Amino acid sequence: MTQLVFHHDINQLNNLPNGTIPVHLYGMGNKKLQIAHIGNMVLDSVKRLGIKLNNQVMDFLTIAMAVTAADTFVLRKDTANGWCRSFSITLPLCQPDIWQKNKVHLEQILHFLSGDIWQFDFHAGGQLPPQPYKLSGRTKLVDLRNKDCVCLFSGGLDSAIGVIDLLEQGNSPVLVSHSYKGDKSRQPLFSNLTKMVILTNFPNLMRLHNHI
Protein backbone atom coordinates (compact mmCIF):
# COMPACT_ATOMS: atom_id res chain seq x y z
CA MET A 1 0.00 0.00 0.00
CA THR A 2 1.37 3.40 -1.00
CA GLN A 3 1.46 5.91 1.86
CA LEU A 4 0.85 9.56 1.00
CA VAL A 5 0.99 12.29 3.64
CA PHE A 6 -0.46 15.70 2.78
CA HIS A 7 -0.15 19.06 4.50
CA HIS A 8 -0.37 22.74 3.58
CA ASP A 9 2.51 23.48 6.00
CA ILE A 10 5.64 22.06 4.37
CA ASN A 11 7.36 21.88 7.77
CA GLN A 12 4.93 19.12 8.74
CA LEU A 13 6.25 16.92 5.93
CA ASN A 14 9.76 16.35 7.27
CA ASN A 15 11.10 13.14 8.83
CA LEU A 16 8.41 10.84 7.46
CA PRO A 17 8.93 7.05 7.28
CA ASN A 18 10.84 5.68 4.30
CA GLY A 19 8.60 4.97 1.32
CA THR A 20 6.08 7.66 2.25
CA ILE A 21 5.24 10.23 -0.43
CA PRO A 22 5.05 13.73 1.15
CA VAL A 23 2.80 16.16 -0.72
CA HIS A 24 2.68 19.90 -0.11
CA LEU A 25 -0.92 21.05 -0.51
CA TYR A 26 -1.53 24.45 -2.10
CA GLY A 27 2.23 25.06 -2.18
CA MET A 28 5.39 24.61 -4.23
CA GLY A 29 6.91 21.58 -2.52
CA ASN A 30 10.67 21.11 -2.30
CA LYS A 31 12.62 19.26 -4.99
CA LYS A 32 15.74 18.99 -2.86
CA LEU A 33 13.80 17.32 -0.04
CA GLN A 34 11.74 15.29 -2.54
CA ILE A 35 8.48 16.84 -1.37
CA ALA A 36 5.86 16.78 -4.12
CA HIS A 37 3.22 19.46 -4.48
CA ILE A 38 -0.24 20.06 -5.88
CA GLY A 39 -2.59 23.01 -6.18
CA ASN A 40 -0.10 25.86 -5.82
CA MET A 41 -2.39 28.15 -7.88
CA VAL A 42 -5.69 26.86 -6.54
CA LEU A 43 -6.02 29.26 -3.61
CA ASP A 44 -5.60 32.23 -5.95
CA SER A 45 -8.37 30.83 -8.17
CA VAL A 46 -10.60 30.41 -5.11
CA LYS A 47 -9.96 34.02 -4.08
CA ARG A 48 -11.02 35.16 -7.54
CA LEU A 49 -14.50 33.77 -6.95
CA GLY A 50 -15.06 36.81 -4.76
CA ILE A 51 -16.91 34.79 -2.11
CA LYS A 52 -15.82 33.15 1.15
CA LEU A 53 -16.03 29.36 1.12
CA ASN A 54 -17.25 27.55 4.21
CA ASN A 55 -15.09 24.93 5.90
CA GLN A 56 -17.02 21.97 4.46
CA VAL A 57 -16.48 23.15 0.89
CA MET A 58 -12.81 23.83 1.58
CA ASP A 59 -12.39 20.32 2.98
CA PHE A 60 -14.06 18.86 -0.10
CA LEU A 61 -11.58 20.76 -2.28
CA THR A 62 -8.67 19.50 -0.16
CA ILE A 63 -9.85 15.90 -0.51
CA ALA A 64 -10.17 16.38 -4.28
CA MET A 65 -6.58 17.69 -4.38
CA ALA A 66 -5.34 14.66 -2.46
CA VAL A 67 -7.18 12.21 -4.72
CA THR A 68 -5.83 13.94 -7.84
CA ALA A 69 -2.29 13.84 -6.45
CA ALA A 70 -2.48 10.15 -5.56
CA ASP A 71 -3.90 9.26 -8.98
CA THR A 72 -1.19 11.33 -10.71
CA PHE A 73 1.89 10.39 -8.68
CA VAL A 74 1.32 6.63 -8.37
CA LEU A 75 1.43 4.86 -11.74
CA ARG A 76 -0.63 1.75 -12.50
CA LYS A 77 2.26 0.16 -14.40
CA ASP A 78 4.25 -0.02 -11.16
CA THR A 79 1.66 -2.21 -9.39
CA ALA A 80 1.81 -5.99 -9.10
CA ASN A 81 -1.03 -6.58 -11.55
CA GLY A 82 -0.42 -3.49 -13.67
CA TRP A 83 -3.71 -1.88 -12.67
CA CYS A 84 -5.07 -1.80 -9.11
CA ARG A 85 -3.32 0.61 -6.75
CA SER A 86 -3.67 0.80 -2.96
CA PHE A 87 -3.55 4.22 -1.32
CA SER A 88 -3.25 5.19 2.33
CA ILE A 89 -3.83 8.94 2.58
CA THR A 90 -3.16 11.05 5.66
CA LEU A 91 -4.90 14.39 5.29
CA PRO A 92 -5.61 17.40 7.57
CA LEU A 93 -9.07 18.96 7.31
CA CYS A 94 -10.87 21.90 8.90
CA GLN A 95 -13.70 19.67 10.14
CA PRO A 96 -12.40 16.09 10.06
CA ASP A 97 -15.27 14.71 12.15
CA ILE A 98 -17.75 15.29 9.31
CA TRP A 99 -15.63 13.36 6.84
CA GLN A 100 -14.65 10.69 9.34
CA LYS A 101 -18.33 9.74 9.61
CA ASN A 102 -18.48 9.36 5.82
CA LYS A 103 -15.01 7.87 5.33
CA VAL A 104 -16.14 4.36 4.36
CA HIS A 105 -18.67 5.76 1.89
CA LEU A 106 -15.99 7.98 0.31
CA GLU A 107 -13.56 5.06 0.04
CA GLN A 108 -16.22 2.90 -1.61
CA ILE A 109 -17.12 5.61 -4.13
CA LEU A 110 -13.49 6.11 -5.13
CA HIS A 111 -12.98 2.36 -5.41
CA PHE A 112 -15.98 2.14 -7.74
CA LEU A 113 -14.75 5.04 -9.88
CA SER A 114 -11.09 4.08 -10.10
CA GLY A 115 -10.83 0.37 -9.34
CA ASP A 116 -8.23 1.22 -6.68
CA ILE A 117 -8.17 0.65 -2.91
CA TRP A 118 -8.46 3.85 -0.87
CA GLN A 119 -7.91 4.40 2.86
CA PHE A 120 -8.14 7.83 4.50
CA ASP A 121 -6.86 9.09 7.83
CA PHE A 122 -8.39 12.50 8.51
CA HIS A 123 -7.17 14.78 11.28
CA ALA A 124 -7.48 18.41 12.36
CA GLY A 125 -5.43 21.36 11.14
CA GLY A 126 -6.58 21.64 7.54
CA GLN A 127 -6.19 24.56 5.17
CA LEU A 128 -8.72 27.25 6.06
CA PRO A 129 -10.72 28.98 3.32
CA PRO A 130 -8.78 31.98 1.97
CA GLN A 131 -10.11 35.51 2.14
CA PRO A 132 -11.60 36.39 -1.26
CA TYR A 133 -10.31 39.21 -3.40
CA LYS A 134 -12.40 42.35 -3.38
CA LEU A 135 -13.78 43.82 -6.57
CA SER A 136 -11.17 46.20 -7.94
CA GLY A 137 -9.53 47.17 -11.18
CA ARG A 138 -6.38 45.21 -10.35
CA THR A 139 -7.90 41.78 -9.81
CA LYS A 140 -10.25 40.11 -12.26
CA LEU A 141 -12.93 38.13 -10.45
CA VAL A 142 -14.94 35.24 -11.84
CA ASP A 143 -18.34 36.58 -12.85
CA LEU A 144 -20.87 34.48 -10.93
CA ARG A 145 -23.83 36.77 -11.49
CA ASN A 146 -26.97 34.89 -12.58
CA LYS A 147 -25.10 31.56 -12.55
CA ASP A 148 -27.13 28.74 -11.03
CA CYS A 149 -25.07 25.57 -11.59
CA VAL A 150 -21.61 24.19 -12.36
CA CYS A 151 -20.68 21.99 -15.33
CA LEU A 152 -17.40 20.22 -16.04
CA PHE A 153 -16.10 21.17 -19.48
CA SER A 154 -13.09 19.52 -21.13
CA GLY A 155 -13.48 21.18 -24.51
CA GLY A 156 -14.68 17.92 -26.06
CA LEU A 157 -18.07 16.91 -27.42
CA ASP A 158 -19.18 14.80 -24.43
CA SER A 159 -18.94 17.68 -22.00
CA ALA A 160 -20.36 20.08 -24.61
CA ILE A 161 -23.50 17.94 -24.74
CA GLY A 162 -23.79 18.36 -20.98
CA VAL A 163 -23.62 22.13 -21.42
CA ILE A 164 -26.26 22.02 -24.16
CA ASP A 165 -28.60 19.99 -21.95
CA LEU A 166 -28.27 22.54 -19.14
CA LEU A 167 -28.90 25.48 -21.46
CA GLU A 168 -31.93 23.79 -22.99
CA GLN A 169 -33.30 23.39 -19.46
CA GLY A 170 -32.92 27.13 -18.89
CA ASN A 171 -29.87 26.93 -16.63
CA SER A 172 -26.90 29.30 -16.67
CA PRO A 173 -23.79 27.20 -15.93
CA VAL A 174 -20.30 28.07 -14.83
CA LEU A 175 -17.94 25.90 -16.89
CA VAL A 176 -15.02 24.35 -15.03
CA SER A 177 -12.04 22.92 -16.87
CA HIS A 178 -8.71 21.34 -15.96
CA SER A 179 -5.55 20.68 -17.90
CA TYR A 180 -2.29 18.87 -17.30
CA LYS A 181 1.07 20.11 -18.52
CA GLY A 182 1.34 19.16 -22.17
CA ASP A 183 -2.33 19.32 -23.15
CA LYS A 184 -3.16 22.86 -22.05
CA SER A 185 -1.98 24.25 -25.39
CA ARG A 186 -4.44 22.00 -27.23
CA GLN A 187 -7.51 23.02 -25.22
CA PRO A 188 -8.25 26.25 -27.15
CA LEU A 189 -8.23 24.22 -30.38
CA PHE A 190 -10.61 21.61 -28.96
CA SER A 191 -12.83 24.33 -27.50
CA ASN A 192 -13.04 26.23 -30.81
CA LEU A 193 -13.83 23.03 -32.72
CA THR A 194 -16.56 22.26 -30.20
CA LYS A 195 -18.06 25.73 -30.67
CA MET A 196 -18.12 25.26 -34.45
CA VAL A 197 -19.84 21.88 -34.18
CA ILE A 198 -22.43 23.16 -31.69
CA LEU A 199 -23.22 26.36 -33.57
CA THR A 200 -23.52 24.44 -36.87
CA ASN A 201 -25.79 21.72 -35.55
CA PHE A 202 -27.68 23.71 -32.90
CA PRO A 203 -28.31 27.18 -34.40
CA ASN A 204 -31.00 27.81 -31.80
CA LEU A 205 -28.32 27.69 -29.12
CA MET A 206 -26.30 30.67 -30.34
CA ARG A 207 -26.26 31.93 -26.74
CA LEU A 208 -23.93 29.04 -25.91
CA HIS A 209 -21.15 30.99 -27.63
CA ASN A 210 -21.14 33.41 -24.70
CA HIS A 211 -20.73 30.62 -22.15
CA ILE A 212 -17.68 28.80 -23.54
Where are these regions (language model features)?
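Hydrophobic/small residue at the entry helix of a nucleotide-binding pocket
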Residues: 157-159
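Catalytic nucleophile serine of serine hydrolases
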Residues: 153-154
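RNA-binding accessory domains that recognize and position tRNA/RNA substrates
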Residues: 1-149, 163-204, 209
